[in-house]
């Protein structure tokens, strides 16, 4: 049985409240779960106690092989329970194909302008 530590939505319309639960990966989002190990109230202000975790039980379930979802892993990383791996996207900062073509065209135009300028400059001969 594949275990997940994930969010289960509660609350009312436009007022979400999430329970952090341990459930079988095949069960529905708000369906059957094994244990409730925390809560997250996104409506509270930033400095309030938005996330409540039962650290002892989370450590137990992590030891049993439960895998946290991305959002829950953020909470666990902030609490120091599990390290979130850094993501690496080396091509993110590179310009796209069209931008590279524009850069190459501008560079070529600058080189041609510099070459034309040196050709048209008069050569002074000192006698």
UniProtKB/Swiss-Prot annotation:
GO terms of molecular function: structural constituent of ribosome
InterPro entries listed in its UniProt record: Ribosomal_bS16 (IPR000307), Ribosomal_bS16_dom_sf (IPR023803)
GO (cellular component) term, any one: small ribosomal subunit
Domain of life where this protein originates: Bacteria
Coiled coil: none
Gene Ontology biological process terms in this record: translation
Protein name: Small ribosomal subunit protein bS16
Originating species: Bartonella henselae (strain ATCC 49882 / DSM 28221 / CCUG 30454 / Houston 1) (Rochalimaea henselae)
Gene: rpsP
């Amino acid at each position: 049985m594949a275990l997940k530590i994930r969010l289960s939505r509660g609350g009312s319309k436009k007022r979400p409240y999430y329970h952090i639960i341990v459930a079988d990966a095949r069960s529905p989002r708000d369906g059957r779960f094994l244990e409730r190990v925390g809560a997250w109230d996104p409506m509270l202000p930033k400095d309030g106690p938005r996330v409540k975790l039962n650290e002892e039980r989370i450590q137990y379930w992590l030891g049993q092989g439960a895998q946290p979802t991305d959002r829950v892993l953020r909470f666990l990383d902030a609490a120091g329970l599990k390290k979130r791996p850094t993501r690496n996207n080396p091509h993110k900062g590179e310009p796209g194909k069209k931008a590279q073509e524009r850069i190459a065209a501008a560079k070529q135009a600058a080189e041609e302008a510099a070459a034309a300028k040196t050709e048209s400059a008069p050569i002074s001969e000192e006698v």
